[in-house]
A protein has these predicted regions:
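Active-site-proximal region of nucleotide-activated glycan assembly enzymes
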Residues: 39, 108-170
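A short, glycine/small-residue-rich beta-strand->loop->alpha-helix junction that serves as a flexible
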Residues: 7-20
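An amphipathic, basic-hydrophobic alpha-helix
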Residues: 62-91, 101, 105, 109
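Short His-centered aromatic/hydrophobic patch
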Residues: 95-99
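Conserved donor-binding/catalytic core segment of Leloir-type glycosyltransferases
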Residues: 175-183
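Conserved nucleotide-sugar phosphate-binding/catalytic loop shared by glycosyltransferases and other
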Residues: 2-10, 28-72, 156-159
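Structural beta-sheet core signal
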Residues: 7, 33-35, 116, 139, ...
Length: 183
């Protein structure tokens, strides 16, 4: 039985594109699915991914809307717990951002292995919040700004993520016979 991996993403292309690359690298060996918010959908081909939409609103700074947003977040946490349990998820990979909060909290409650991915050189607030609970955080550098020193042992430095087709072997018989040199 393959392990079930859920990739939580959304928001900007800076979160979604790395999630799609991770998805494609894992899909042959694991049962992979992905969640995104509505903003992240525009970066995804829905037919290409096992995708579920979790529309998470940012918590408002408006004092009148804050209680409403808090109640919505509680509902989404329960929805996330139900989703994680129902789908028997073994590993949650979060690309950060507030859209991952309910699923990461659900994973923490259900004791599901949590892996974080930080696509930036400055540690994001969501990843900073969950750094204590995660097993590893994948970064492009050991020198991520605002990273707590006591959790440096959790960093796993990885090379820049590339789509699988960049690794495919090229047919050497298909090479160019002539080379144009522009001077």
């Amino acid at each position: 039985m393959n392990k079930k991996i859920l990739i939580s993403t959304g928001g900007s292309g800076g979160h979604v594109i790395p999630a799609t690359i991770i998805y494609k690298h894992l899909e042959g060996n694991f049962d992979v699915s992905m969640t995104s918010d509505l903003r992240g959908i525009k970066f995804l081909n829905k037919d290409e991914y096992n995708l579920r939409i979790f529309n998470v609103r940012p918590i408002s700074k408006n004092l009148l809307l804050m209680p409403f947003d808090f109640i919505l977040m509680i509902i989404l946490i329960f929805k996330s717990i139900y989703f994680l349990r129902k789908n028997k998820i073994n590993i949650l990979i979060s690309t950060g951002g507030y859209m991952s909060l309910p699923l990461c909290i659900g994973a923490k409650i259900l004791n599901i292995k949590l892996l974080l991915f930080e696509p930036n050189m400055v540690l994001g607030r969501s990843n900073k919040f969950f750094i204590n609970y995660c097993q590893k955080i994948f970064c492009y550098s050991n020198n991520v700004k605002k990273f707590p020193i006591k959790f440096k042992n959790k960093i796993k430095v990885i090379p820049a993520l590339l789509r699988k087709n960049f690794y495919a072997k090229r047919d050497s018989n298909n090479s160019l016979d002539a080379i144009n040199l522009l001077i």
